[in-house]
Curated annotation (Swiss-Prot):
It comes from the Eukaryota. It comes from Drosophila melanogaster. Belongs to the LAMTOR4 family. Regulator of the TOR pathway, a signaling cascade that promotes cell growth in response to growth factors, energy levels, and amino acids. As part of the Ragulator complex, may activate the TOR signaling cascade in response to amino acids. Keywords: Lysosome. One of its GO terms (cellular component) is Ragulator complex. This is Ragulator complex protein LAMTOR4 homolog.
Length: 120
């Protein structure tokens, strides 16, 4: 794990971040996601997929955040001011893995194992 500038720490236990333009171009990156254009492309594909969800499935609902959950870390993806923010967050605190619930209505995808993972 790389050390990041304190200014770029968006959340506690953050181990990486990407900031993208709406078209997927990487504006900034750091930590485990430093210069990770592959992950940026995968996430843009996921975001494009969410735009094709049938309105009758989720009427009058707008996705505010996507969480991709793994055993030891998770990704939180949101959009603000025409930028896409992707944060990789460790579930460990002082070497102890904590568990999180992903039953939130904002959670779109949950995969607890790394075996079929797209982002790892």
């Amino acid at each position: 794990m790389l050390k990041m500038d304190r200014e770029k720490l968006i959340v506690p236990n953050q181990i990486g971040y990407l900031i993208l333009k709406e078209d997927g171009a990487v504006l900034e990156s750091g930590g485990d996601l430093k210069n990770d254009e592959r992950s940026a492309n995968v996430i843009m594909g996921l975001l494009n997929l969410t735009e094709t969800i049938d309105e009758s499935f989720m009427p009058s609902s707008s996705c505010e955040r996507i969480t991709i959950d793994y055993e030891h870390h998770y990704y939180s993806i949101c959009m603000s001011n025409r930028r896409i923010y992707i944060i990789k967050i460790s579930k460990s605190q002082n070497g102890v893995t904590t568990t999180t619930s992903s039953s939130s209505s904002n959670s779109v995808y949950n995969d607890a194992s790394d075996s079929g993972a797209v982002l790892a």
